């Protein structure tokens, strides 16, 4: 756990007196969305030399086109949840200048197909059972489907008499997950086009570790137990919770290392003096 940021809703940022009573610093009193704050933290961590493989986020962040685009602009790999109605195009979409019967020709090209919801385009996809890792009770598996698409997150454009739709944006993976409970989840990822379905599933499900860390911080290490109304007090409390988590995690990793060492097979080498040779 490297970073935590406090999100202040509009009811707070619109009340300067309330912010001042709580001791919120001026630079944090402005209104910010959660995706904006996440990008700020990622920039701060990258500037500090932190390296990571893939940015993971739930649909609360994944539905934000500026968030996804900011990650791609920074050269980062990402895998994020999205709502089922997120619009996408097939990869063969083209931009054309449709002929008009009357009036001047169009100044801007438009897509030659309509965008469709994510869940619709995956209806014809092949779903396969994939195991992404082993758990305490065996392999963790679900049914997945994936296809390359263009995300409909470009500028909005009115096409003909229809309502405006977003232009094709970045090419990415659209992934669907069909859980044993019947629930379906949808994701986008900019992992490389040659990524296997198992790799995509493993990247998506790695977010479980983050969720477990948050749960442990809140329930076992007291992050949720702060009852004050001071910016400084809250941040001191959060820092202590994070330090406790870092300590426990280091102990956990040390114990795992010892366990692996103790299970390592030992080999006995026969000494040269006991080896029978030929003259």
Residue ranges and their predicted role:
Residues 199, 210-217, 253-256:
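Extended hydrophobic-aromatic, low-complexity segments
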Residues 85-90:
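Short gly/pro/ser/thr-enriched loop/turn and capping motifs at secondary-structure boundaries
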Residues 181-208:
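Extended, non-catalytic structural segments that build the interaction scaffolds
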Residues 8, 15-30, 34, 39-43, ...:
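A short, flexible helix-boundary coil/loop motif
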Residues 167-172, 177, 200-204:
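Low-complexity, glycine/alanine/valine/leucine- and proline-rich hydrophobic stretches
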Residues 1-84:
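Polybasic low-complexity intrinsically disordered regions
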Residues 55-61, 78, 187, 208-217, ...:
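Short, conserved catalytic/metal-binding motifs centered on acidic residues
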């Amino acid at each position: 756990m490297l970073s935590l940021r406090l999100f202040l809703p509009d009811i707070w940022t619109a009340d300067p007196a309330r912010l001042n009573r709580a001791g919120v610093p001026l630079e944090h009193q402005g209104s910010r969305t959660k995706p904006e704050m996440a990008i700020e933290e990622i920039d701060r961590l990258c500037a500090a030399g932190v390296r990571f493989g893939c940015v993971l986020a739930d649909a609360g962040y994944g539905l934000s086109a500026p968030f996804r685009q900011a990650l791609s602009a920074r050269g980062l790999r990402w895998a994020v949840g999205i709502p089922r109605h997120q619009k996408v195009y097939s990869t063969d979409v083209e931009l054309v200048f449709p002929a008009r019967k009357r009036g001047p020709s169009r100044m801007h090209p438009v897509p030659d197909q309509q965008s469709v919801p994510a869940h619709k385009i995956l209806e014809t996809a092949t779903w396969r059972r994939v195991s992404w890792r082993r758990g305490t009770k065996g392999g963790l598996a679900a049914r997945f489907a994936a296809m390359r698409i263009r995300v409909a997150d470009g500028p909005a454009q009115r096409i003909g008499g229809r309502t405006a739709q977003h232009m094709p944006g970045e090419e990415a993976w659209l992934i669907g997950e069909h859980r044993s409970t019947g629930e379906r989840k949808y994701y986008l990822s900019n992992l490389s086009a040659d990524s296997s379905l198992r790799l995509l599933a493993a990247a998506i499900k790695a977010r479980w570790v983050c969720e477990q860390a948050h749960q442990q911080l809140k329930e076992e290490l007291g992050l949720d137990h702060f009852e004050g109304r001071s910016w400084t007090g809250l941040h001191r409390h959060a820092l202590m919770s994070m330090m406790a988590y870092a300590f426990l995690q280091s102990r956990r990793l040390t114990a795992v290392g010892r366990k692996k060492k103790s299970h390592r097979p030992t080999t006995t080498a026969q000494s040269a003096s006991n080896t029978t040779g030929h003259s």
